């Protein structure tokens, strides 16, 4: 059934391309039509100018050819995979057995892309300028004496305590007030999400941290000190939302199964005390976060999801009757953008939720510093049509937190970059944008010298010291995803720093 499904998908691609050729202008060059046809069948067409020739030639085009069934003796898409995983990949149909493009057209398409691509990306020699961060006081935290840090979970519970998990599956609670660490449990593999709701704790393990088509992720539940496992095995889940969407008194579980070549957004409805029924809401890889919010004022909570692989997009899934959903993509991004996170907040105070996105995931086949990485503000016109109104460039941007951190009535932002330009701007791994004028999108940017002490991977915000203002918490993951200066890499791995708490000094307990 799976093979038939993907053969049908490839047939649809061919039909789409046929009509695009049929409707194209006779004056339009064939190579342009080929690019606009084949490069839009699964996602929006990237700008050829967004990547240099070498990356197109050595990384992108060979993979693109494999996905169109073109065999290349210099490139093996299955290299490094075990036989059993190759079998799983073959069943997906991602790499079709028969070519969907002729050899002549494939040669023409490659030559066109290489001829149009720049030798290198234009560099903006004007660096971001930063002020010294004074509103927040950096407070480094170490959980143990072990050098390096591999934190994969950073959340807060209802008592403002930090919940942390690591690559080894260890889960613990950290009380900032007394610096006490309390173990919660050991779950075998990297922990990526944690939720406490209605007396039940939900713990999500990704399974394979590295890209894989194997499904080995799990959700554990803890109730009355008894740990159980939801029977369904998941494909690299990275985010779990536990929420009573239809307000019937029973929580649903919405799981972002990031996957790899394939993936999905899944809904689990409880059948009995042990079993769940699974429904697929989005059948595409790279789902990284989902938020529940009524987006059309019909009294039903909808789902807003970010997908970050290939067809990078924000989708609103409008809730219908009987927990059915109607999906609408409201934002689409180039497949080379590296979408990483989003937030939903009413930026301009007009009563409609706007979307804040960051893109900068650079641990892929196209590693190079990219001037289009950064944060974007997309304003809602009131009918869930979103338009980009502001862009703040930041190499390798991966997370954003949005709040009125200085309590002056507008929205400020905290940004982290897991893939900054460490050679020239290591301090840009964290940036605080203080909003000076929300109407003109005027911001002052701040950072702190100690920001280079960790490779910031996760970020959260909460009033962790209970003094009335919102603090920012950063966690470090010192794995070398991408090239890093040797001195900096040594600094991370000779240090036992795990967290950096940016304590907001706007309000102190002495003032209360």
Description of each model-found segment:
Residues 25-33, 38-512:
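Beta-propeller-forming repeat regions
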Residues 1-30, 34, 38:
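Bacterial Sec-dependent N-terminal signal peptides
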């Amino acid at each position: 059934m799976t093979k038939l499904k993907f053969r049908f998908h490839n047939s649809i691609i061919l039909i789409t391309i046929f009509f695009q050729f049929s409707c194209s202008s006779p004056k339009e060059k064939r190579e342009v039509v080929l690019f606009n046809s084949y490069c839009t069948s699964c996602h929006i067409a990237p700008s050829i100018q967004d990547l240099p020739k070498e990356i197109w030639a050595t990384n992108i085009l060979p993979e693109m050819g494999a996905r169109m069934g073109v065999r290349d003796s210099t490139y093996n898409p299955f290299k490094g995979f075990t036989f059993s995983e190759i079998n799983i990949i073959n069943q997906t149909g991602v790499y079709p057995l028969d070519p969907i493009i002729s050899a002549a057209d494939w040669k023409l398409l490659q030559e066109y892309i290489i001829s149009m691509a720049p030798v290198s990306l234009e560099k903006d020699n004007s660096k971001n300028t930063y002020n010294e961060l004074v509103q927040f006081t950096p407070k480094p935290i170490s959980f143990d004496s072990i050098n390096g840090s591999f934190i994969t979970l950073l959340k807060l519970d209802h008592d403002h305590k930090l919940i942390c998990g690591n690559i080894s599956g260890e889960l613990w609670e950290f009380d900032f007030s007394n610096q006490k660490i309390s173990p919660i449990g050991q779950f075998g593999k990297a922990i990526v999400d944690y939720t406490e709701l209605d007396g039940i704790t939900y713990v999500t393990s990704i399974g394979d941290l590295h890209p894989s088509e194997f499904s080995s992720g799990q959700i554990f539940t803890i109730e009355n000190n008894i740990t159980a496992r939801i029977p369904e095995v998941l494909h690299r889940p990275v985010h779990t939302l536990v929420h009573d969407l239809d307000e019937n008194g029973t929580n649903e579980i919405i799981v972002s199964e990031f996957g790899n070549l394939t993936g999905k957004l899944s809904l689990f409805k409880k059948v009995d005390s042990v079993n769940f029924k699974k429904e697929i809401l989005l059948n595409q890889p790279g789902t990284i976060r989902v938020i529940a919010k009524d987006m059309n004022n019909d009294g039903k909570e909808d789902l807003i999801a970010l997908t970050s692989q290939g067809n990078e997009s924000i989708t609103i899934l409008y809730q219908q009757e009987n927990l059915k959903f109607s999906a609408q993509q409201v934002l689409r991004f180039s497949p080379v953008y590296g979408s990483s996170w989003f937030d939903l907040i009413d930026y301009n105070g007009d009563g409609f939720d706007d979307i804040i996105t960051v893109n900068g995931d650079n641990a892929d086949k196209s590693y190079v510093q990219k001037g289009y990485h950064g944060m974007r503000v997309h304003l809602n016109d009131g009918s869930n049509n979103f338009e980009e109104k502001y862009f703040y460039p930041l190499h390798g941007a991966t997370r954003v937190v949005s709040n009125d951190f200085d309590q002056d009535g507008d929205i400020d932002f905290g940004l982290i970059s897991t893939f900054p330009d460490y050679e020239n701007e290591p301090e840009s791994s964290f940036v605080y944008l203080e909003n000076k004028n929300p109407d003109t999108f005027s911001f002052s940017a701040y950072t702190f010298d100690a920001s280079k002490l960790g490779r910031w991977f996760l970020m959260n915000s909460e009033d962790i010291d209970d003094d009335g203002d919102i603090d920012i918490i950063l966690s470090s993951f010192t794995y070398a995803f991408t090239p890093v200066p040797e001195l900096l890499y040594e600094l991370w791995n000779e240090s036992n720093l795990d967290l950096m708490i940016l304590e907001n000094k706007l309000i102190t307990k002495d003032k209360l």
